[in-house]
Amino acid sequence: MQSEYAGTPRLRCRRRRLSHGEARPGSARTRPLDRPEGVWTEPDLHLFPQDGHRYEIVDGSLFVAPPAPRWHDDLVGAVVTTLRAAAPPGWWVCDRLGVAINQGVSAGSNLVPDVTVLRPRSSGATWSDPADVALVVEIETPATRRYDRMLKPTLYAEGGIRAYWRVERGPVSPTLSVYELGPGGFRLRERAEGAEPIKLDTPYPVRIMPSAWA
């Protein structure tokens, strides 16, 4: 699932994916941004400069996150490596693959999780359908703490995504919080940190040792 353009995630995930607005080496945009007259929509994400910020749309409103620190990208890579090593044939583990949530209360939302796991025989849409998504993972930073703890899990739950992981950096070892979808939204199932491994069965059997991500 290789992305050829920062604003259009595609169904290939063999190498690191550019986030919305993340610059390719040597690239630049100089034309002014044309603001929409109404709500923001997915095509508007193509208008932004590739300056390292992450641009997402929530219910037609624009949300912008500052460029992530290097340790964040290192953690994303470590989580992807763990999930790919355990993935059964046919599953896709993607970093920064867009998800379009266009149902329920959250109609008109385009989100970019740090890590996305897609089920076999996924639709292949430019923006993934939540029905194809088995797991989303967010790596929390100081700038995205409230966003990753409150708003984005609510939207993922409204889209029907069954599993959500949140990873915090921690002073010694990352901490993994594992959530599963219940009747009222996501509920905490397990929390792990340090060198004590845990075994999870969602999205597929996988052994996690958070200290290995440090």
Residue ranges and their predicted role:
Residues 1-214:
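Gly/Pro/Ser/Thr-rich low-complexity, intrinsically disordered segments predominantly at protein N-termini
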